[in-house]
């Protein structure tokens, strides 16, 4: 089975790439966790599709499996839900050498990871992402969190998984909106780090949208390699890793202001990337031609490029609560050229100029 390794010294772990191979998961997971006692967390959308396949494979490998199914969507990513799951873990008899398996998209991965990070001060954790967004973003890098009503991912930890399993066959069950949400993050990697990935997406956009397996596998693996490289250089987001938040400053503000209901995460990031590029253009960091090229690709995918019914002053206030802002300064990830990004301090009035 194809895999790459995220290099974090003693916390290094593999990301496996497969197609319709859930039957092999039990034997793979067994290599990476300390005991056979495991707790699967999934949601009501994913449960009927993949739970039995995973459960069967784990039981063939003699795992003692317990599980919990939660409502799908961002509204489950709360302290209340985390507490409920932690109490279930205790009721099921999980010990310090037990493991948590996240079977689902980004929300499931985040809250399951948070449970694993906090239960008995941290237990083993396995990621099985079932959305394109989770496969290329939240399942890689060890950031786990829950939301507060006023902000996204405010309560969290860094807790690296023992392994990640990416099965591209699951993408065939996603609707187009979910595929596009993941594609937004993949485009982001090309913009901030490796412009050859951006060019590959430009040249193969229609095949990618048609879910051609070889094209999808290429951009997913490339995205994981890019994120893995950045994480290995800056695991705790002290400096470099912050560039992964490109598009997220305004994106998170839009999500919070709309109650996490109007836009899925990738859509908000797409809008955020457009505005981050407008800001870089206004500040003279990139030229018009480069801006138009990025805007055109995002538009061609069918992702949104603008928000509706929000006041720019409210967006700025939400941005001030962003984790990237420190000492009352607004920190923004901005482009400095093709495949180059950095965190820059930006004045409030500069942001207001580009917002509508």
UniProtKB/Swiss-Prot annotation:
EC number: 4.2.3.4
Pfam families in UniProt: DHQ_synthase, DHQS_C
Cofactor field: Co(2+); Zn(2+); NAD(+)
Enzyme class: lyase
Cofactor binding remark: Binds 1 divalent metal cation per subunit. Can use either Co(2+) or Zn(2+).
UniProt cross-references to InterPro entries, sorted A to Z: Dehydroquinate_synthase, DHQ_synth_AroB, DHQ_synth_fam, DHQS/DOIS_N, DHQS_C
Entry GO terms, CC: cytoplasm
Annotated Zn(2+) binding sites: 185, 248, 265
GO biological process, one term: amino acid biosynthetic process
Metabolic or biological pathway: Metabolic intermediate biosynthesis; chorismate biosynthesis; chorismate from D-erythrose 4-phosphate and phosphoenolpyruvate: step 2/7
Binding site for NAD(+): 106-110, 130-131, 143, 152
Location of the protein in the cell: Cytoplasm
Catalytic activity of the protein: 7-phospho-2-dehydro-3-deoxy-D-arabino-heptonate = 3-dehydroquinate + phosphate
Keywords attached to this entry: Amino-acid biosynthesis, Aromatic amino acid biosynthesis, Cobalt, Cytoplasm, Lyase, Metal-binding, NAD, Nucleotide-binding, Zinc
MF (Gene Ontology): 3-dehydroquinate synthase activity; metal ion binding; nucleotide binding
Cited function: Catalyzes the conversion of 3-deoxy-D-arabino-heptulosonate 7-phosphate (DAHP) to dehydroquinate (DHQ).
Family designation: Belongs to the sugar phosphate cyclases superfamily. Dehydroquinate synthase family.
Protein name: 3-dehydroquinate synthase
Species this chain originates from: Thermoanaerobacter pseudethanolicus (strain ATCC 33223 / 39E) (Clostridium thermohydrosulfuricum)
Phylogenetic placement of the source organism: Bacteria, Bacillati, Bacillota, Clostridia, Thermoanaerobacterales
């Amino acid at each position: 089975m194809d895999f790459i390794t995220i290099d974090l010294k003693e916390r290094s772990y593999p990301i496996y790439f497969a197609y319709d191979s859930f039957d092999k998961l039990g034997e793979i997971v067994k290599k990476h966790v300390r005991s056979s006692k495991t707790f699967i967390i999934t949601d009501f959308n994913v449960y009927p599709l993949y739970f039995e396949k995973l459960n069967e494979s784990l039981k063939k490998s003699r795992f003692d499996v317990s599980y919990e199914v939660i409502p799908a969507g961002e509204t489950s990513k709360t302290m209340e839900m985390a507490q409920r799951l932690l109490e279930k873990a205790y009721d099921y008899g999980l010990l310090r050498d037990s493991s948590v398996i996240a079977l689902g998209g980004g929300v499931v991965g985040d809250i399951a990871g948070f449970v694993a990070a906090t239960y008995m001060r941290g237990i083993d954790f396995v990621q099985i992402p079932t959305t394109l967004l989770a496969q290329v973003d939240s399942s890689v890098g060890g950031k786990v969190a829950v939301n507060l009503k006023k902000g996204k991912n405010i309560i969290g930890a860094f807790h690296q998984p023992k392994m990640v399993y990416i099965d591209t066959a699951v993408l065939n069950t996603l609707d187009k909106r979910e595929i596009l949400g993941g594609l937004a993050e993949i485009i982001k990697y090309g913009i901030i780090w490796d412009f050859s990935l951006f060019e590959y997406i430009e040249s193969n956009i229609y095949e990618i949208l048609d879910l051609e397996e070889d094209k999808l596998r290429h951009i997913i693996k490339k995205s994981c390699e890019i994120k893995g490289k950045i994480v290995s250089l800056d695991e705790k987001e002290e400096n470099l890793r912050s560039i992964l938040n490109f598009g997220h400053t305004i994106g998170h503000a839009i999500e919070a202001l709309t109650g996490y209901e109007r836009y899925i995460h990738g859509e908000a990031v797409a809008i955020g990337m457009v505005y981050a590029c407008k800001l870089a253009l206004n500040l003279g960091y990139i030229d018009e031609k480069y801006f138009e090229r990025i805007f055109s690709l995002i538009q061609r995918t069918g992702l949104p490029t603008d928000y509706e019914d929000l006041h720019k002053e409210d967006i700025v206030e939400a941005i001030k609560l962003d984790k990237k802002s420190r000492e009352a300064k607004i920190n923004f990830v901005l482009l400095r050229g093709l495949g180059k990004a950095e965190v820059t301090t930006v004045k409030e009035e500069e942001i207001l100029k580009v917002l509508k």
